[in-house]
Amino acid sequence: MKLLLDSHAFLWWLAEDPRLSAGARQAVADPAATVFVSAATIWELSIKAALGRLDLGGADLVEEIAGNDFVELPVKARHSLAAAYLPRHHGDPFDRMLIAQAQIEGLTLVSRDAALRAYEIQILPA
């Protein structure tokens, strides 16, 4: 299975937070799974940390990706174009990027955001 972690799913995984569903935890831990973290997610979390809205506890998110055997997913031009032309069911630009990436790359998005269900993507509840 190829998974793309939404920002909250990524943070919950790192913190071993019980809010991450058992199904999501099992899927991410599966050695056969390839787990992606978007560069857009790192950008989003870094912005929130810089604004004082998120405490990363000194975590180096890039090191956390590698340390958990996740794969960094770059934002490509085709992702950007697809995100721009998605239906306006969801207004958050970071979530729209993840939707576009999931569609183009054939990934299952791990998220608890109910608004994402309006799009034609596979979702694993976080």
Regions found by a protein language model. Give the residues of each.
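Active-site neighborhoods of divalent-metal-dependent phosphate/nucleic-acid chemistry enzymes
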Residues: 53-58, 62, 66-115, 121-126
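Short glycine/serine/threonine-enriched helix-capping/active-site loop
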Residues: 37-38, 75
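Phosphate/NTP-binding elements of NTP-utilizing enzymes
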Residues: 45
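Short, well-structured N-terminal submotif of metal-dependent ribonuclease cores
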Residues: 1-37, 50-63, 105, 114-118
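Residue-level signal for well-ordered alpha-helical positions
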Residues: 16-17, 48, 86, 122
